[in-house]
Swiss-Prot record:
<keyword id="KW-0547">Nucleotide-binding</keyword>
<dbReference type="Pfam" id="PF08264">
    <property type="entry name" value="Anticodon_1"/>
</dbReference>
<keyword id="KW-0436">Ligase</keyword>
<dbReference type="InterPro" id="IPR002300">
    <property type="entry name" value="aa-tRNA-synth_Ia"/>
</dbReference>
<dbReference type="GO" id="GO:0005737">
    <property type="term" value="C:cytoplasm"/>
</dbReference>
<feature type="short sequence motif" description="'HIGH' region">
    <location>
        <begin position="64"/>
        <end position="74"/>
    </location>
</feature>
<dbReference type="InterPro" id="IPR014729">
    <property type="entry name" value="Rossmann-like_a/b/a_fold"/>
</dbReference>
<dbReference type="GO" id="GO:0000049">
    <property type="term" value="F:tRNA binding"/>
</dbReference>
<feature type="binding site">
    <location>
        <position position="650"/>
    </location>
    <ligand>
        <name>ATP</name>
    </ligand>
</feature>
<dbReference type="InterPro" id="IPR013155">
    <property type="entry name" value="M/V/L/I-tRNA-synth_anticd-bd"/>
</dbReference>
<dbReference type="GO" id="GO:0006428">
    <property type="term" value="P:isoleucyl-tRNA aminoacylation"/>
</dbReference>
<dbReference type="GO" id="GO:0004822">
    <property type="term" value="F:isoleucine-tRNA ligase activity"/>
</dbReference>
<keyword id="KW-0963">Cytoplasm</keyword>
<keyword id="KW-0067">ATP-binding</keyword>
<keyword id="KW-0030">Aminoacyl-tRNA synthetase</keyword>
<dbReference type="GO" id="GO:0008270">
    <property type="term" value="F:zinc ion binding"/>
</dbReference>
<dbReference type="InterPro" id="IPR033709">
    <property type="entry name" value="Anticodon_Ile_ABEc"/>
</dbReference>
């Protein structure tokens, strides 16, 4: 049984004292007072300025969009950022926490379109780009005040005064510089490619934008299997009386059929020919069963002519187009051969629409389809991709002009049926990419875009990724590593309005081609082109349309007629956020030394999907520009969902307003819930709507910490004791003091290890916030439910003895250390305790340094102390569990426990007397008996793991079964299990090849374990004598009096009179025998017992009853 579970059991069974100190504690109000204290005293500012500028810890705060309110995901990220920043600050580092805002891009434009009532690029251009962008500029920070309120209330320290915005001129100039550098390195090119396209936003997306935020979701599409009629019969298939040869093609996008320009078959597929009504249908051999099933279902007679048709028989055959919109295109409407065609789905033959498929585009381009010069970009795109920005067909597709492509599917299928070309239709459920902003299904279309040639630097990115400490560690070679291995060139241009413009000017006359790329506004560097130098005009805004007005003659045109005009695209906003490490500092124009000395960042965190978003774009640009990874350590946290695993949304009404949670419970509880959960380590948090999980943190974490502080102050104030911090363990001689001090030092070290050391079990260096939180929880469990409870009598004694002072000093010392080390994880409540305990150190706990325990060395004796104490805590848990199950009151003393040692365990046999005494007192038992013959009370049951044994010694399986049945096995002194006997054939089994279960033969027995190790078995003697019963009654009376004191709100130091009325002889005898014990425990100055009592004599007393003993008890405060 683990220590924490044991202590929970002790707390539950003993009905511990904690509750008396927590009633009325308003942690939310306490937090608000602390927030005000930090603000009034500039504690955050001091926490930065008090640290050495040359000893920096750098973390990047990813810029959010400020046009919506923060959600729980933002809070989680913020809690992790703030915790690490506070921890490193207390470790002595200077941690700047500059906040940033993502201002450009689709989120801002979509909001502006909605609020302005304009939709689409043409409408925006008619409205006016200048007016539209000005609206975006003014609305993009719409919720910045609310963001600040949320962040402040979550006790997160952020520098808003020096925030950066991606729309600032300085930030945008650094983006210009980075693009110029990429251009100079040969990593930028313009090309026509098939890209994911949001027709709702009227812009292309990056390939990674289709992989974030669950962009893929199920969609039902109407599919069609249609027949393309060959113009010539395949020579190997010529048969008399065949009137037509048709190729069957399956497609999930019927709307692309009007743009069909070719068909593709595979050299690796065998094809079939089947005859229906004198027409031969050709399809892959793998499709034959589907073909036959369809024919049988619809009573269609067919004859299989051949199932071994070679692709060579079909290559370059011409076919009749289904639609005549491209009848004039040379080289079109032929059967082409391509390796990408597979037979897993469909007919093994694919229709090619080069404007709407990547493979289609590449294959047709190789074949010169269409026969248009690549340089004539506009004509090529208008031909192969005849749709407008909104996804509607243009005039070329005359039958469907101005119809959205998705709306044409049914009409196209109807036309196919009318032409007798439709073989079958189906509904097809598949995962399909959707726009991350509008939730509309994307299309893939040909567009001219500007690209970063990521494939050129992919291998270097893979190498640099090995130097990053990912948390969790599997991200390195898993989610992020695999993404890098499959990295594609990045389309960074967007044909939108509100964003940093691409600094590219092109000649408007293709006869005099020229491209100018600019890297700065003013001429700062000799080798970087500057806008003001070439255009001879001051520039104070790079946004459209002002930047578009910069036009100059083409220097390469001797006629002087052509002009240099800027390409109209703006940057993908992911390029902007990926540039924040240097752009926030206006590098290289300012802060050059600061950036170069502290790049890459020490730490970064966001949720795990950013491996395909911000983390990725940071990595691309950092590798390309600086040949370095952008960060050294990265936490990829998980996602906050509702209890059903659904995304939190207003529509589902499945989450509580975070500010209401903060108002009711405070933010520390929410912080610790998230930090201590696997969500801080990549898992998902299923958060209830009613705040139950947050309340649990109050009860299990914050209250225990507060209780320990409260316990100290109550009794220290009564005794007027000024405690001090113990600096040397040698000063401590009390066994309980020594234990809790050692446990404190061990806990601090475990937190340091979790946050800073390499952990082989999880494969990363530090930043294990969950483990650090668990250490804090476990310590305060031990402090409250073991140390303080076991030492209450020392604090309650009436005299100020040396032992009492030592107890105060010990509790004060561990609170001093633990408040410090817990401060990053519970910043507000630890600050409150720090202020109240007046440690006479720094003004704030967050200005102090983490505990320095290097000078404190735990000796072997100290380690043994911890081991023995944990052992007796476990034994206590076992005994209390038996009492609980067998309904034996804890206050009822018992005669003895017998402990049977397993394998002569020395920890049990050598348990010192002083620990035995603590154990006996705790479990309320009179004596311990140790025995070694465990077989008298328990037996082992061996179960072999045959699959594992079969891997190692498969030929011995019969022998093993025989030995097991004959019970020929034993555990050796070294802990290994031997099957067989040494004189004959025997086998030493590995740990994973068997399980050994111990079965006890008494209902009053329990196994004793420490960690994974079996130590022995204990048996509780439940025999009761009159003496034991009377002592139990005395303890019950003490409990009733204490409960009555609490119910009547007496102070813990109040003296009382007690009157007991009962006719129970056993109760009378008990009171007489245990009189001194009862009055001492309850601070009673008198205790009188009566058989009958006049109510008038106790009119001023508080009354309570003990029903199972027919006892009435009266107390009065003196």
């Amino acid at each position: 049984m683990c220590i924490v579970k044991t202590l929970h059991l002790i707390t539950h069974v003993m009905k511990e004292y904690n509750s008396q100190f927590t009633e009325g504690s308003d942690f939310s109000l306490i937090e608000e007072q602390i927030l005000e204290f930090w603000k009034e005293n500039n504690i955050f500012k001091k926490s930065i300025e008090n640290r050495d500028e040359k000893r920096r810890f750098v973390f990047y705060d990813g810029p959010p969009f400020a046009n919506g309110l923060p959600h729980y995901g933002h809070l989680l990220t913020g809690f992790i950022k703030d915790t690490v920043a506070r921890y490193k600050t207390m470790a002595g580092f200077r941690v700047d926490r500059r906040f940033g805002w993502d201002c450009h891009g689709l989120p801002a434009e979509m909001l502006a379109e909605k609020e302005l009532g304009v939709s689409g690029k043409l409408a925006i251009e008619e409205f006016g780009i200048e007016k539209f962008n000005n609206y975006c500029r003014n609305s993009v920070m719409k919720f910045s005040r609310e963001w600040k309120q949320y962040i402040d209330r979550q006790s997160r320290w952020v520098d808003f005064e020096n925030d950066y915005k991606t729309m600032n001129l300085s930030f945008m100039e650094s983006i210009m510089w980075s693009f110029y550098q990429l251009w100079q390195k040969g990593l930028i090119y313009e090309s026509i490619k098939i890209v994911p396209y949001s027709w709702a936003c009227q812009t292309p997306l990056s390939n990674f934008e289709t992989r974030i935020d669950n962009a893929y979701r199920q969609k039902t599409s109407k599919t069609v299997t249609l027949a393309f009629e060959l113009l010539d019969a395949p020579k190997s298939l010529i048969v008399d009386n065949i009137t037509a040869y048709k190729i069957l093609v399956w497609t999930t996008t019927p709307w692309t059929l009007p743009c069909n320009l070719a068909l593709a078959i595979s050299p690796n597929i065998k094809y079939c020919g089947a005859i229906i009504n004198k027409e031969m249908y050709i399809f892959s051999r793998a499709y034959l069963k589907n073909f036959e099933d369809h024919c049988k279902k619809n009573n269609i007679e067919y004859l299989i002519h051949s199932d071994d048709i070679c692709y060579l028989s079909l290559e370059y055959l011409s076919y009749k187009p289904v639609f005549n919109y491209f009848i004039d295109i040379k080289n079109a409407f032929k059967v082409l051969v391509a390796d990408f065609v597979v037979e897993d789905e469909g007919t093994g033959i694919v229709h090619m629409a080069p404007g709407f498929g990547e493979d289609d585009f590449i294959l047709c381009k190789k074949q010169g389809i269409p026969d248009i010069d690549d340089k004539d970009t506009s004509k090529l795109l208008a031909t192969i991709c005849p749709i407008d920005d909104g996804g509607k067909f243009t005039e070329r597709i005359s039958d469907f002009v101005n119809m959205h492509v998705f709306d044409t599917n049914d009409q196209i299928i109807s036309i196919l049926k009318a032409k007798n070309l439709c073989f079958k239709t189906d509904q097809y459920l598949h995962n399909y990419p959707h726009c991350w902003r509008t939730d509309t299904p994307l299309i893939y279309r040909a567009m001219s875009s500007w690209y970063v040639e990521v494939t050129k630097i992919k291998n270097r990115m893979i190498d640099l990724n090995k130097d990053v400490n990912w948390i969790p560690s599997h991200i390195r070679s898993g989610q992020f590593g695999k993404w890098l291995e499959n990295a594609k060139d990045w389309a960074i241009s967007r044909n939108r309005f509100w964003g940093t413009p691409l600094p590219v000017w092109k000649s408007d006359n293709p006869n005099y081609p020229r491209i100018d790329v600019y890297g700065s506004i003013k001429k700062v560097f000799d080798d970087i082109k500057a806008l003001e130098e070439d255009f001879d005009i001051p520039i104070d805004d790079l946004h459209r349309p002002y930047i578009d007005n910069l036009v100059r003659p083409n220097p390469d045109d001797p006629t002087g007629k052509s002009m240099m005009r800027r390409v109209t695209d703006v940057f993908d906003c992911w390029f902007e956020s990926g540039s924040m490490p240097y752009a926030q500092l206006h590098y290289p124009f300012e802060n050059k030394e600061l950036f170069e000395n502290y790049f890459p960042a020490d730490f970064i965190t966001e949720y795990v999907a950013q491996t395909r978003g911000w983390f990725y774009t940071l990595f691309v640009l950092s590798t390309a520009l600086f040949d370095k990874p952008p960060f050294k350590n990265c936490i990829c946290h998980g996602v906050v969902l509702d209890t059903q695993g659904q995304k939190l949304s207003k529509r589902l009404n499945n989450y509580a307003d975070p500010m209401e949670i903060f108002k009711q419970y405070g933010s520390d509880a929410m912080r610790f819930l998230m930090l201590s959960h696997t969500v801080s380590y990549g898992g998902d948090l299923l958060l209830d709507k009613d705040g139950v999980m947050v309340r649990d943190v109050i009860r299990n974490v914050i209250k225990p910490m507060w209780n320990s502080y409260n316990f100290f102050t109550i009794y220290a104030d009564i005794d007027k004791v000024s405690a001090r911090v113990i600096s040397d363990l040698d000063e401590v001689d009390n066994i309980m003091d020594k234990y809790i001090m050692c446990e404190c030092i061990s806990t601090i070290q475990s937190i340091f290890n979790a946050m800073e050391e390499f952990d082989q079990s999880v494969g990363n260096y530090g930043y294990n916030i969950k483990a650090a939180c668990n250490s804090i929880v476990q310590f305060f469990e031990v402090l409250n439910n073991w140390y303080i409870r076991r030492c209450r009598s020392r604090f309650w004694s009436s005299e100020i003895t040396k032992d009492k002072v030592n107890a105060y000093n010990t509790l004060y010392t561990v609170m001093y250390y633990m408040v410090k080390v817990s401060a990053p994880f519970l910043p507000a409540i630890t600050e409150a305790i720090w202020q109240k305990l007046n440690f006479q150190e720094e003004e704030s706990v967050h200005l102090s340094l983490l505990p320095n325990i290097e000078h404190i060395t735990l000796k072997d004796e100290d380690q043994k102390n911890i081991q023995y104490m944990k052992l007796i805590i476990n034994i206590c848990g076992c005994v209390l569990s038996i009492r609980n199950v067998r309904n034996i009151r804890v206050r009822q003393p018992l005669n003895k426990i017998t402990i049977y040692s397993y394998n002569n365990n020395n920890d049990l046999f050598n348990l010192p007397v002083k620990y035995q005494n603590i154990l006996l007192d705790e479990i309320n038992v009179k004596s311990i008996v140790f025995k070694s013959n465990i077989e008298d009370i328990a037996s082992f049951q061996l179960k072999l793991n045959f699959p594992e044994l079969g891997k190692r010694i498969p030929e011995k399986m019969k022998n093993l079964i025989s030995l097991l049945k004959s019970n020929q096995w034993k555990v050796l002194e070294n802990g290994q299990l031997m099957l067989g006997i040494r004189e004959g054939e025997y086998y030493i089994l590995e740990d994973n090849e068997y399980t050994l279960n111990l079965k006890v033969h008494s209902e009053f027995a329990s196994t004793i374990t420490l960690g994974p190790n079996l130590l022995g078995v204990l048996v509780l003697d439940n025999t009761l004598t009159d003496e034991l019963i009377m002592e139990g009654i005395a303890r019950d009376i003490v409990r009733i009096i204490q409960q009555s004191r609490k119910d009547n709100k007496f102070n813990v130091s109040d003296k009382i009179d007690v009157v007991i009325c009962t006719q129970d002889k056993m109760v009378k005898n008990s009171v007489q025998a245990w009189y001194e014990y009862i009055v001492q425990q309850t601070l009673s100055l008198s205790l009188v017992i009566h058989e009958n009592l006049d109510a008038n004599n106790v009119a001023e007393y508080c009354k309570t009853t003990m029903k199972d003993r027919n006892l009435t008890l009266f107390i009065k405060k003196l």
